[in-house]
Amino acid sequence: MAVASRQLKPAMMMLLCVSTTAWGDPGDDSLPPPPQAQAVNDEAVFQLALVLNHYDTGLVVPVTQRNGAFFISSADLLRAGLPPEHVPAGEVNLASLSQVRVEYDSAAQRLLLTLPRDWITARVTPFSAQTAQSKPHYGRGALLNYDLYTNHTEHIGGQASLWHELRYFDENGSFSSTGYARKNFTGNDGQQEGYVRYDTTLLITNEDDATTWSAGDVISDALSWTSSVRMGGISYGRDFSLRPDLVTWPLPEFSGEAAVPTSVDLFINGYRSGSTQLQPGPFTLTNLPYINGAGDAVLVTTDALGRQVSTTLPFYVTSDLLKTGLSDGAVTLGSLRRNYGIRNFDYGPAAGSGSYRYGVTDWLTLEGHAEGAEELALGGAGTVIKLGRFGVVNTAYSQSRMRGDNGGQISWGYQYSTSEFSVATQHTRRDRGFGNLALYDQPTVYDENDRPVASFSRNTDQYSLTFNLGQYGNIGAAWIGVESFDSQKTELLNLSWSRNLWGASSIYLAGSRDQQRGDWTVALSLQVPLGERDSAAVTFENTPDAGSSQRLNYNHSMPSDGGFSWNMAWANQSKSSDYQQGTLGWRNNNIELQGGGYGERDMMTWWGEAMGAIVLMDGELFAANKINDAFVVISTDGHPDVPVSYENQPVGKTNNNGYLLVSGVSAYYPASYRIDTLNLPADTRLKETERRIAIRRHSGYLVDFPMEQERVASVILHDVHGQALPVGSQVRRVSRKNAVVGYDGIAWLENLSDVNPLEVISPDGKRCKATLTVGANPEHKLQTYGPLVCREGL
């Protein structure tokens, strides 16, 4: 074998040489040369975080390193905030940007760009979280609000009346109708009997753009210098109350520049309003806390080294303005309503009205108003102007032509408010021939000069001034002057002072002077709380007509979840007999009852009242308290007597069918509804115990807390020697979650079947098996089984 091997070696060498020569012939496939190190490093693509002037943009972008330079797409640079005039199109070689310094942080995988300061625009930083829009919930149902009232006055007689509101609501909107019926008793024939309809209205809301459609009996929109009228027709307009998350007036914005990451604290009029974090670069603080009037904002910035800089910035905020670009207004078309509250269907001539407001800038809001009828044309314009930090001026002018008479109205005013004092004035001047829809359908009566008697006042002037004196209380003064076209004047001067005393007690002093009569009305009142729900008051009053009186009053308020309330009062009157008053009230979740008496000796009036609502929803009929706006129905899946809380206040328990109606709900506010599960059976399983939702206006919604019964039990597990299985042992079941053995061998098992094979693994790895058989539990009580013997080797 050794000889053979030596003989094969030359042949093998020849074969290898031939083969090698054959593989190297031209035209045959060949392996590529090994890459050079320089070629490998010429180009590489990284996913890097982009940082501008120490500010982390939050962007992770592809960056190409080619021949020692960094390339990035222009779109990514623009997204990061670089100005377009400095960014070439396409792929950008950062080295070509002569004013940009580039640094690659390989450890943190970041690309650091240092830019000129004038390249970076101010970043808008919300100071506080913007209140999110809450999607309103709504259901389908109907309700009947009612108010039954009756009284009887000695020597005069009595009457009974029933007020109602019938309302239907669904996903499209709501329909409501209100009215009352009255019946007079013997001796009280002076008041109208029968049924009187008030309003019948279809309401459709759009919360996304804060607009409403109304059809039926509507009220026209008005500005501060115009009048509203009742009409039968349609109305469309903006309604910002549908969006409580919106701030419609301009709030101050504070701008600056931070060289390094910085925290900023805001103090408004000496009180800390909050804080936020700032990244390096120019910034603009927005979404500041709600403030009003004049004041000073102090910004205190603190950098990473603890260095602080304080800046004081004055401001003036008023809700009379609209934000820039924001508009408000409404249009109403129909027929003027006549004899409201007297006749059911009495409509006059056709008419139309429209108002509009627009925020031109943060310091200027323009207003416009127009009215029209067959013999009326009215147009007007106004402005609201902020004078820097020195208050707000409003002006308006209207011109009308009604039944051949021309007239104008001009109004102007000024308001200024701070935390220490406020001042306001408002003035109106009118021509005799000025008219609008409020006068258009009035009975036309002329005086001896052939002038219509029904008209507005010629001049109106109002002045008010208030001071906050700190521990010495608050004082206020107001003067109102009205002059008619026949030169009759009404001039009133009002003065007031109030101050908090010990605890929550307070004192109030007020005086009013009629300039034409030359007399004063004076009142002094002392309020003293007596516990959580009780209070007492002492009042001294002197009037020109009634003389002097001294009044004592005691009040007990009703708990939020129902109960009793009462009020007692007595007054000594110098020009008449003593006055006495007593009221007793009681309320539960179904109804509110009140009754009492008031008056003087031999002239007492006794009265009683029952208020509530009847609601149909989710196939259930409910008796509830009066529902002024929205409501919810709590459902606990048929479980009775479950306590319910609304905004952390107890409001009652579910009925026998597992329902509770909560009537005092504010529309569009995301309120909290919570149930107390302590009294539920132990085998009850819940997905949630609290929900926070908002309800649409004039609507109701079913707030459901789904529950299901689950077979649960405790089991005691022992070994064959009668000893409890070790703590921490794992109890396994097929298609079920593992359970853990606690002290005394007790394990809590859920989702049980009739027969449940158990496998137990102790902490040392030993295994044993047992079988748990569960019986019926119709009362859903917590049951404990065992001890069961867990045997090895089964």
PLM feature spans:
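Short, ordered, surface-exposed loop/turn motifs in non-cytosolic proteins
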Residues: 41-48, 56-61, 638-648, 721-734
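Feature captures outer-membrane beta-barrel proteins of Gram-negative bacteria and organelles
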Residues: 134-136, 160-172, 193-207, 348-362, ...
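Transmembrane beta-strands of outer-membrane beta-barrel pores
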Residues: 148-154, 181-185, 217-221, 262, ...
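Post-signal-peptide, soluble extracytosolic/periplasmic N-terminal scaffold domains
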Residues: 2-16, 24-248, 544-615, 623
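Short, acidic Ser/Thr/Gly-rich low-complexity loop/linker segments typical of extracellular
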Residues: 649-658, 735-746
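A short, amphipathic beta-strand motif
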Residues: 50, 256, 632-636, 711-720
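Short Pro-Gly-centered beta-turn/loop motif in secreted/extracellular proteins
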Residues: 64-72, 288-294, 659-685, 743-758, ...
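Extracellular beta-sheet/turn segments enriched in Thr/Pro/Gly and aliphatic residues
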Residues: 110-114, 317-323, 689-709, 773-794
